[in-house]
Amino acid sequence: MNKQLTIKPGEIIVVKLGGSIFDNKDTTIEDVVSLQKQDKPLVLVHGGANIVTKWLNQNNAKTDFFQGERITDRAALEMVTAVLGGLVNKEIVAAINTGGGRAVGISGVDGSLIQGRIRDKNMGYVGNVVKVDQSLLTVLLESGFVPVIAPVSLHAFDRPEASPLLLNINGDTIAAEIAAAIGADKLILLTDVNGIHDESSRLLPCLSPTEAEALLASGVASGGMIPKVKACLRAVSSTATTCVIIDGRRKHALLDEVTAGGSGTTIKNTG
């Protein structure tokens, strides 16, 4: 008989697995299984932009990015849904389950988990999160599963009649909105760099929200780091959540962060 858990919001850890570290995901999967066996409630959100780009290129489809996010026309949206909601999501779930864990793969569409609207028509079908319905997450967590979430979301607000029912929303953004909605203890962003660096390329181990905002305004945080910093700012804006950006390529980076901490860049309220 499967164990039922009583989950307190402040215990939950939200993890964003960046697509750029998928070639090195073996220890991350091991860490997820290890933490689950310790009854650590985890929510895993994944990306996979590089894999989507590969499939688009194989189909001779153009793809462009703006400030670290994909401009998404209808063809790109279909590819994002198929690759992230299908292939990538199920590979991660299969790896966790065959590794001794218990995971369920979903997207932001399932249970109306992530509901959004189009952000900017120039970005195509890229959305902002308007609402998080955590009902399905609660059921999965209390049933002892790790929810593995693909960043495809429900086009629930202000949808023109001919528009798709789906939206592409950045995985960092989704992870942050979930962390904020459930009052997570920590949001951990696993990426392919060891944190945020200053203009002299020195690692910044700890930042206040004000300091992080200054890095965005000055352009020091650029490219793919922009949505990550914005995600951290969202996660810590109204909760006691701590956000950490770490190098997921490092062996057992996730396990080390949860059990000891101290690597990468931490953004938190200090007041």
Kindly give the residue locations of the regions a language model identified.
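C-terminal catalytic "cap/lid" subdomain
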Residues: 1-271
